[in-house]
From Swiss-Prot:
Protein name in UniProt: Phosphate import ATP-binding protein PstB
KW Cytoplasm (keyword) present: no
Function comment: Part of the ABC transporter complex PstSACB involved in phosphate import. Responsible for energy coupling to the transport system.
Top EC class for this record: translocase
Catalysed reactions, semicolon-separated: phosphate(out) + ATP + H2O = ADP + 2 phosphate(in) + H(+)
Positions contributing to ATP binding: 37-44
Ranges of residues in domain ABC transporter: 5-247
EC number(s) per entry: 7.3.2.1
A single BP term in Gene Ontology: phosphate ion transmembrane transport
Keywords, in A-Z order: ATP-binding, Cell inner membrane, Cell membrane, Membrane, Nucleotide-binding, Phosphate transport, Translocase, Transport
GO molecular function per UniProt: ATP binding; ATP hydrolysis activity; ATPase-coupled phosphate ion transmembrane transporter activity
Quaternary structure and partners: The complex is composed of two ATP-binding proteins (PstB), two transmembrane proteins (PstC and PstA) and a solute-binding protein (PstS).
Length: 252
């Protein structure tokens, strides 16, 4: 099993508050790794370390080592814009740009210089929308605003936007929390299909979702990594009592 990303002794501080306490976790390639735990446990903070989104928070400081294919992503020589293309992110609330459906997907490849012609750009947009399971629904309305889509469609548009710049890893921070059950099921099916081409890390509050979509699960509590393992093992025979208590609804 190849390790795509690795965090070693990762600590995150917000000014003088330590939010993560020395997290060490491997992210296997072409698998879905779910990060679970109660609100405020640090799972989203840890997720944002993987593409340096915490850099945008005033007073945030990260120590430890995080690597992508063995390369330290916090090295001073790293181009953060390029890193965020390689490690894409889908947020909790669908956030399409105030542009057309087509331009939402075309924007990334264009600014990253990934296309040489209009025809090539059209191909990337169509391929990305198809991978996100959205093309057939929007192919006759690509000129319409991305915000005109339903919530579930907007989230799939955001996934297409992330895919369009050919990432290696896709981070998802509770991507279904604002969606209805039908839209959630579509996203979950999509996640399972996408792992053939991408490595996925998902933060979720839904135990059922973590069990359905992931191959590996990591349990967080109060800024600590409680345990990590194959999802089936975590949900059927966890080693730690805190994991058992959380999964069975005794706290959270």
């Amino acid at each position: 099993m190849k390790i795509k990303m690795r965090g070693q002794d990762v600590k995150v501080f917000y000014k003088d508050k330590e939010a993560l306490h020395g997290i060490t976790l491997d992210i296997p390639e072409h698998k879905v790794t779910a990060l679970i735990g109660p609100s405020g446990c640090g799972k989203s903070t840890f997720l944002r370390c993987f593409n340096r989104m915490n850099d945008t928070i005033e007073g945030a400081k990260i120590t430890g080592l995080i690597t992508l294919d063995g390369e330290n992503i916090y090295d001073s020589q790293i181009d953060v814009v390029e890193l965020r293309a390689r490690v894409g992110m889908v947020f909790q609330k669908p956030c399409p740009f105030p542009k057309s459906i087509f331009e939402n997907v075309a924007y990334g490849p264009r600014i990253h210089g990934l296309v040489k012609s209009r025809a090539e750009l059209h191909d990337i947009v169509e391929k990305s929308l198809r991978q996100a399971g959205l093309f057939e629904e929007v192919k006759d309305r690509l000129h319409e605003a991305g915000t005109s889509l339903s919530g579930g469609q907007q989230q799939r548009l955001c996934i297409a936007r992330a895919i369009a710049v050919s990432p290696e890893v896709i981070l998802m921070d509770e991507p279904c929390s604002a969606l209805d059950p039908i839209a959630t099921a579509r996203i979950e099916e999509l996640i399972d299909a996408l792992r053939k081409d991408y490595t996925i890390v998902i933060v979720t509050h839904s135990m059922q979702q973590a069990a359905r979509v992931s191959q590996y699960t990591a349990m967080f509590h109060l800024g600590h990594l409680v345990e990590v393992g194959a999802t089936e093992m975590i949900f059927t025979s966890p080693k730690e009592q805190r994991t058992q208590d959380y999964i069975t609804g005794r706290f959270g």
